[in-house]
Amino acid sequence: MELRLYDTATREKRPFVPLHRNNVRMYVCGPTVYDFAHIGNARPVIVFDVLFRLLRHLYGAEHVTYVRNITDVDDKINARAARDFPGLPLNEAIRNVTELTERQFHEDVDALGCLRPTIEPRATEHIAEMRDIIERLVAGGFAYVAEDHVLFSPAAMNAANKVLPRYGALANRSLDEMIAGARVDVAPYKKDATDFVLWKPSKPGEPSWPSPAGIAAEGRPGWHIECSAMSWKHLGETFDIHGGGIDLVFPHHENEVAQSCCAFHTARMANVWMHNGFLQVEGEKMSKSLGNFVTIREVLADWPGEVVRLNMLKTHYRSPIDWTLRGLEESAKAVDDWYRTAGDLREGRPADAVIEALRDDINTPLMVAVLHGLRNEAASGGVDDVARFVGSLRLLGFLAEDAAQWRARKQQASGVDAAKVEGLIAERTAARARKDFKESDRLRDELAAMGVVLKDGKGADGKPVTTWEMAR
């Protein structure tokens, strides 16, 4: 089956045909580095990591470029820097905040089993490209200067030639609908309520750079222009896939399309637009006011990254996901079982059925069902069945540790005394050898009360062997 992806722009699932088969290009909006990423931020990271892995499998790792940006210039960053480092000059405080937060983000997503993108550009390293695009937009009549701001005019875009897309087409809204449905800044320097900022003057002490379009005062970029500049620099005027959360469709992605298409006179910025659905916690929208706001780091303190990863992938990426304790517990049991079944094997080719599930618009619920079937085949089959199961899991970012490491980390997290457990198992083994099954059962119950699950089997020499792990 061919790869088919749902395109937000056309609102249909259609075959994916890369612009250049030997250079498949994908851009995904990354974090604004001012605070710990919350669990909802993990969803696009995991979803597009799976797509990245699939594209590498289909086209070859050397033929796929994945760009995910770092936004390191933003009002939220300025506010956090002033709050956390009041005794430092603002620029130095900002550097402390962005470097720390970026490092925390990388630690979190690494723990989730995500590959690093091919390129991870920072906004502040692409100011020249932003100014270049802004100059083109002003020269083309799509943007104008007012009170040291540069603003983009959607009305000018929609009045232009038919090569350009209509502003609002991605979000499937008219200009009137966008005005009515959004909190629009109607600053007096705007010609129209829908106009949005490309560049603005910096306040004293804020980060600033020489301004475009003949503006004497230094300033800084608006949010939307950053992604247009970084995607252009690293992927070109038009590329294959642009991804992000559903909340970014409007205004962020709509404005990216407007800036890029008008600057380069193209009909498309990206051939396919993909958006993941919202995340809610125990049936409610996640928010600090409800007390259910959870960071990735907080979740990882209680659950292994592979458990979090599986819990995300059990729901199709376009559907809303309900983040629940029960779901995490079920995912933990599944990952434990996968490690037991895989044993020490870490090589193998992925099953065709897994690839076919992913070819169908990254159908991860079907993929998970296939994995459970492969697990059953591996548990009762031969080494080829285990290898196919392992290869499938490895492709998807699972089995990052060997089985012994997984068990040891789980045991350590439980706080159980491993030496005591081993001693009780030895006593039970001796009781079984002398056929004292009452004592054997008593010891098993004692271990179960400690949260220890026993698995009786035979070693290579045919003698009885008992292994153990902690129950979740």
Curated annotation (Swiss-Prot):
Motif 'HIGH' region, residue range(s) on this chain: 31-41
Q: Where in the cell is it found?
A: Cytoplasm
Which superkingdom does the taxonomy of this entry point to?
Bacteria
Enzyme group, top EC level? Answer: ligase
> Where is ATP bound in this sequence?
288
* One Gene Ontology CC term in the entry: cytosol
User: What is the recorded name of this protein?
Assistant: Cysteine--tRNA ligase
